């Protein structure tokens, strides 16, 4: 496995692979890798000739009061897991390598971001599409791999790819969970012992919402109330950042319960904000 920090060196290696007609699979991450990331790598390894993983904590997707400086980082750990998983290139650029100067052209996401994380984290998705635009140009992937846990991000990135004709196939992989149902996340390390015991209730509440919808319930307020009560069995209502149901991938009010629907939750603990979701009537790509 090559560890590359320079974008010019990355482009040269990618060009050689392209000239050899190799398909490239790309797994963009912010590092502190866990089983969820490695599941994406496993799919990339099976479906691509050459696998590139990026580890870059992107400052433009963090708000002024968010955890950019505190976000967990462990390059040695990441490199070990990446090599064991069969990654060919681990791209680990500095902030200066990706953002050498102040941007003269800025991307702004208009749709699919007025609710949930888009509303809760102003400017977050602008930063996501900005860094992915840069990375897609550098890596030129045939396939790019994302997890369903970040479903709103997936919808936004799908819009980016469609709007700007990126020649990349997005592969959306099911959320990887702990044995008790908690979605694997780099932020789980921030949980206290008590919070870690409580956190699986997020997934339990989402499963309850799915069960109600699939049984024919269409009273959205009732569904959300029952999910809220489920979470409140383990934690306090004040910790719920959002618990909502929208059409997917549009993130608009549900008008047709037979089409794509997302049930989404975000819960704030003392040092971690955890998100999770359930998708209904949605096929992963």
Curated annotation (Swiss-Prot):
Signal peptide bounds: none
GO biological process: pantothenate biosynthetic process
Residues binding beta-alanine: 61
Pathway membership, UniProt: Cofactor biosynthesis; (R)-pantothenate biosynthesis; (R)-pantothenate from (R)-pantoate and beta-alanine: step 1/1
Keyword RNA-binding: no
EC number: 6.3.2.1
Residues the record marks as active site: 37
Reactions performed catalytically: (R)-pantoate + beta-alanine + ATP = (R)-pantothenate + AMP + diphosphate + H(+)
Keywords assigned by UniProt, alphabetized: ATP-binding, Cytoplasm, Ligase, Nucleotide-binding, Pantothenate biosynthesis
Location(s) in or outside the cell: Cytoplasm
Gene Ontology molecular function terms on file: ATP binding; pantoate-beta-alanine ligase activity
Domain of life: Bacteria
Record keyword Plastid present: no
Binding site for ATP: 30-37, 147-150, 176, 184-187
Annotated residues for binding of (R)-pantoate: 61, 153
Primary location: cytoplasm
First-tier enzyme category under EC: ligase
Described purpose of this protein according to its UniProt entry: Catalyzes the condensation of pantoate with beta-alanine in an ATP-dependent reaction via a pantoyl-adenylate intermediate.
Other comments on record: The reaction proceeds by a bi uni uni bi ping pong mechanism.
Subunit-level organization: Homodimer.
Descriptive protein name: Pantothenate synthetase
Species per Swiss-Prot/TrEMBL record: Listeria monocytogenes serovar 1/2a (strain ATCC BAA-679 / EGD-e)
